[in-house]
Swiss-Prot record:
Record gene name: oppB
Keywords of this entry: Cell membrane, Membrane, Peptide transport, Protein transport, Transmembrane, Transmembrane helix, Transport
CC per GO annotation: plasma membrane
Metal-binding is among the record's keywords: no
Function of the molecule: Part of the ABC transporter complex OppABCDF involved in the uptake of oligopeptides. Probably responsible for the translocation of the substrate across the membrane.
Annotated organism of origin: Mycoplasma pneumoniae (strain ATCC 29342 / M129 / Subtype 1)
Entry protein name: Oligopeptide transport system permease protein OppB
Subcellular location: Cell membrane
Length: 389
């Protein structure tokens, strides 16, 4: 994201455009003064550094054309229009893609599979704006509104709003559904060749039961990452669709702000558009854990980072302790030997703290050398604590 924002910053500011314009010589002087106050006359690298400094201080910067408005108010005021078109089209497109992908995979080699494959190739190849232009022509035949009605329009009417939503949403649905159909169909074909599908059929399960309980889930799991790319693709297609159908959304703001060199507005738009797929990928990872039992099993049987660090620390402590031991400061005791039994009778061994508590007389009785600080009992290294009195 940082690299993308850096490239966009320098590209936008290399156009020579300014966000303010003048209609007279008097206005020109005022505009020059204001541009100087905004720092437009500073070197580009200085403005770049100032932008990041402002951003990390918690400010999105100034909207030059109207300093009284904040950047977040402008963008988030248009977000509902964008999310409505993008998310609805993505939901419908992915649902249709899964359905047609399942049908195409289950009936591979049949006429319906061939027809679906032709349509998939067609709609994947044709850009969304070309589909949109074709739908604009069709809108007149079905008496559908050619322009989108935004949420903040003065003449907003829910019935007309739904009718005006059909064409923009369909423009994005075709590509999304085609992409999902292609991926799901390939996964279905691969799953159908697995041994557990043959086993399910040999048990007498119907085709519907096999498809629903075995093929469907195992085909969808590998297709989950496609949801992230699908959302990114829907946002990318939204740039042209919003311009084509008059959707006052985030993409439309981005286009206008680039043309007027509203750098701060452009950068926040890029952050927002880049952030949506990022959040979607995090959400998809969480979904993966729910739908894929292999991940749950691996997580349950795996070792956390904290546990790994704990093991490393304990191992290093164990090595340090053994480095201090030599033949002069340690005494070997074999399991079930007379010495071991005597220690058990004395209840001198503390396995919890890896210590042995003995008096000087007990050490003499057990024939433990006075210089010994440790007792080696099997794989245990027990520190000797001398009890006085």
């Amino acid at each position: 994201m940082f690299i993308v924002m850096t490239i966009v910053f320098f590209l936008v500011n290399s156009t020579g455009q300014t966000p303010l314009s003048a209609t007279s010589s008097k206005d020109l002087e005022a505009v020059k003064t204001q541009l100087d106050a905004f720092g437009f006359n500073d070197p580009l690298i200085v403005r770049y550094g100032r932008y990041w400094q402002t951003l990390f201080s918690g400010s999105l910067g100034t909207y030059y054309s109207s300093p009284n408005q904040t950047i977040d108010q402008i963008v988030f005021g248009r977000v509902p229009n964008t999310l409505y078109v993008v998310l609805i089209s993505f939901f419908i497109g992915s649902l249709l893609g899964i359905i047609f992908g399942m049908i195409s995979g289950l009936f591979r080699g049949k006429l319906i599979d061939a027809v679906i494959n032709v349509l998939v190739v067609l709609f994947v190849s044709i850009p969304s704006f070309v589909v949109g232009l074709g739908l604009l022509k069709a809108a007149g035949l079905f008496r559908l509104p050619p322009r989108f009605i935004n949420f903040d329009d003065a003449n907003f009417n829910f019935g007309n709003f739904l009718l005006a939503s059909i064409i923009p949403i369909l423009s994005l649905v075709f590509y999304t559904s085609a992409a999902f159909t292609y991926r799901v169909r390939n996964e279905v074909v691969e799953v159908m060749n697995q041994d557990y599908i043959k086993t399910a059929r040999s048990k007498g399960l119907s085709t519907f039961a096999v498809a629903l309980y075995h093929i469907f889930r195992n085909s969808i799991i590998p297709s989950v990452p496609l949801f992230v790319f699908g959302i990114s693709g829907a946002f990318s297609g939204g740039f042209i669709i919003e311009s084509l159908f008059g959707v006052q959304g985030v993409s439309r703001i981005l286009i206008d702000s680039v043309q007027s060199n509203e750098t701060n507005l452009v950068m926040f738009n890029i952050m927002f558009i880049q952030g949506i797929p990022l959040l979607a990928s995090v959400f998809i990872e969480l979904i993966y854990v729910l739908v894929d039992p292999r991940i749950r099993i691996a997580s349950a049987g795996g070792v956390s980072l904290w546990t790994k660090l704990k093991f490393v620390y304990l191992r290093q402590a164990w090595l340090r302790k053994w480095r201090r031991i030599n033949h002069t400061n340690s005494h070997n005791v074999l399991f079930n030997s007379p010495q071991h039994r005597q220690l058990l009778e004395l209840k001198a061994i503390d396995y919890k703290h890896n210590t042995i508590s003995l008096t000087e007389q007990q050490k003499t009785t057990l024939k433990i050398e006075p210089t010994a600080n440790f007792v080696l009992l099997g794989t245990k290294c027990l520190k000797i604590i001398t009890i006085h009195g």
